[in-house]
């Protein structure tokens, strides 16, 4: 999974301060204001497109801290089918 993080970080031109994988029960990932990306340990058990979506989503928050128009536009550019993903945990 960290290989995918490196791929997406390069593609999105961001550099997370720390990437950690841990047990998460309510979310698939998060991005802190201090640049820490946290991914759910069981994310790796999901399909590759969903994993890419979550990683891209969290890393993109390093550039755009909200879910506004710029964020959704960039998500559509990088992960065109992201709106069809079932993100509920």
Model-inferred region functions:
Residues 1-53, 62-89:
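Active-site-proximal or metal-binding-adjacent scaffold patches in catalytic folds
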Residues 58:
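Walker B catalytic acidic pair
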